[in-house]
């Protein structure tokens, strides 16, 4: 537990509710946890916190006093009471000269520490870690808490090395599989980016409960920052919460809006609204993924860049980086990497926030997609026509974009019209934040509201857009006025355009009316 006191030197947010959960499952069949999250989400922080709380080698009561866990009845019952084996696979991989020997290095390192702690127990040579843990349990009655950080790094970084994977899977199987491990394991906590691999590692770890970016269940609020936590931080550090939300919000885990902690801490300390993602990860990591030649992949990326949600079947992804065979596999992997958010109720993927939108835009532009370049040109013409208040041209451009680029979306109702419109205004993403869908107003919900980024506010008005399917544009405009939609952004000080768009299924024409909103003096 050396150095674990550093964990709480800058305690931004209390995440000790995770300890409350792990205490509740100790020494049960639910005590096998695999908690996967993207980089920069505080996975190692959580692992260090658990080690600091449980480890006999730590004296951490003062560290946890005043935090949520200290108020629980069983706080002292488990505090610093266990032998904790804390393995950082990334560290071992980085410090192993030959990756083929990394599993041996892990085993030898842990065995060496066990011999130091229990010199009288190991009177003969023990070469397998599970055997050593069983001996300690038999001689002392002591069970272990095993924490493995970056558990999946050998699955990701050594994906093509079958020898290493086989050795590692056998190591995991020996540690966790069967009845013998239940005799020496009090808690097993694995954390990484990927969930358990569906083919090879599943047989070794199928007794683990999984908490992922697809389904975080009870652990949703404990990795990443919740909206309430970020709002509290924004007040404490005098930051504009709405702006923080636009830039860094967007991950949906269970019923929580989750923020990337790395980005939130960065903006609180530095006061700069920018992509902190690029400081610790290059867009080059995602570029090969979005350029894979799978039907519908580039279209899906373009749709999401424009603010739309895209259906994704997450069941086909094998949870490794080698067996990617479809658009859905790519999108699911991007969800686990944090480049996409996921709504488990609608089973759709989306770009979560402005920070990630910038990263993906750079990744797309780095390869100069022909599809993207041509589409952007048409979208720019649509935006220019909107700003020029040329309703006829807007109708013509929407029709052209629908017919030539996104005809796969057939008009059946207002929802399908809104999907086409969101994609058609893709070029607006350079100047505007992600459109707000169905923004609550005085007497209803506006279909779309586009708010310009601060640096473009002088030249680009806010847009309030109402859609009508199989009605006329005048009806859409009248609804904007009757239901007082502009009151939803009445504190916005720039210009506002009201945009009514309709589609007539009989004549198959788009109509558009645009008016400038005159604020009441």
Show where each model-derived region lies.
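Substrate-engagement module of ASCE P-loop NTPases
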Residues: 135-137, 166-188, 488
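Amphipathic alpha-helical segments of the small helical/lid subdomains adjacent to P-loop NTPase cores
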Residues: 200-206, 211-267, 300-301
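Walker A/P-loop nucleotide-binding motif
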Residues: 32-47
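Mid-core helix/loop region of P-loop NTP-binding domains shared across ATPases and GTPases
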Residues: 105-148, 152, 175-182
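Pre-Walker A adenine-sensing motif
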Residues: 16-26
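Flexible phosphate/Mg2+-sensing switch loops adjacent to catalytic phosphate-binding sites
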Residues: 53-80, 125, 437-439
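Short, small-residue-biased leader/transition segments that mark boundaries at the very start
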Residues: 2-8
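Extended alpha-helical interface modules used as scaffolds for assembling large macromolecular complexes
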Residues: 259, 264-478, 482-484, 495, ...
């Amino acid at each position: 537990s050396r150095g674990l006191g550093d964990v709480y030197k800058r305690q931004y947010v209390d995440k000790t509710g995770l300890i409350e959960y792990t205490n509740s499952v100790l020494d049960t069949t639910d005590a096998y946890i695999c908690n996967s999250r993207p980089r920069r989400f505080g996975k190692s922080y959580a692992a260090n916190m658990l080690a600091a709380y449980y480890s006999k080698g730590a004296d951490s009561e003062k560290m946890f006093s005043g935090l949520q866990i200290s108020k629980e009845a069983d706080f002292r019952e488990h505090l610093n009471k266990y032998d904790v084996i804390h393995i950082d696979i990334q560290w071992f991989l980085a410090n192993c000269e030959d990756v083929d020997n990394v599993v041996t290095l892990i085993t030898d390192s842990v065995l060496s520490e066990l011999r130091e702690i229990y010199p009288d127990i190991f009177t003969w040579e023990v070469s397998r870690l599970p055997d050593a843990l069983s001996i300690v349990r038999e001689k002392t009655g002591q069970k272990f808490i095993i924490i493995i950080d970056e558990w999946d790094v050998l699955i990701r970084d050594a994906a093509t090395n079958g020898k290493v994977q086989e050795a590692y899977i056998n190591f995991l199987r020996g540690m966790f599989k069967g009845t013998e491990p239940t005799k020496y394991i009090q808690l097993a906590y694995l954390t990484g980016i990927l969930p358990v691999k569906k083919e090879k590692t599943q047989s070794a770890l199928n007794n683990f409960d999984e908490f992922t970016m697809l389904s975080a269940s009870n652990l949703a609020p404990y990795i990443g920052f919740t909206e309430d936590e970020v709002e509290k931080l924004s007040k404490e550090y005098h930051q504009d919460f709405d702006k923080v939300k636009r830039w860094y919000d967007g991950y949906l885990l269970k019923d929580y809006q989750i923020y990337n902690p790395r980005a939130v801490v960065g903006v609180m300390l530095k006061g700069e609204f920018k992509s902190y993602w690029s400081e610790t990860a290059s867009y080059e990591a995602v570029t090969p993924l979005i350029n894979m030649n799978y039907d519908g992949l580039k279209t899906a990326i373009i749709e999401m860049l424009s603010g739309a949600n895209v259906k994704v079947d997450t069941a086909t992804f094998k949870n490794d980086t080698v067996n990617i065979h479809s658009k859905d596999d790519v999108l699911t992997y991007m969800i686990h990497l944090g480049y996409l958010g996921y709504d488990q109720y609608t089973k759709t993927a989306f770009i979560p926030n402005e920070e990630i939108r910038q990263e993906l835009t750079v990744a797309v532009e780095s390869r100069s997609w022909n599809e993207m370049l041509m589409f952007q040109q048409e979208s720019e013409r649509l935006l220019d026509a909107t700003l020029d208040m040329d309703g006829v041209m807007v109708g013509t451009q929407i029709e052209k974009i629908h017919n030539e680029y996104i005809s796969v979306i057939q008009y059946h109702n207002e929802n399908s019209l809104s999907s086409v419109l969101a994609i058609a205004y893709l070029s607006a993403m350079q100047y505007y934040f992600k459109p707000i869908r169905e923004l609550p107003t005085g007497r209803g919900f506006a279909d779309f509201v586009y708010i310009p980024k601060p640096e473009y506010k002088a030249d680009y008005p806010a847009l309030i857009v109402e859609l009508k399917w199989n009605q006329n544009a005048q009806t859409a405009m009248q609804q904007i006025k009757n239901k007082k939609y502009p009151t939803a952004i009445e504190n916005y000080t720039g210009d506002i355009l009201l945009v009514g768009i309709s589609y007539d299924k009989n004549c198959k024409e788009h109509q558009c009316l645009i008016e400038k909103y005159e604020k009441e003096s």
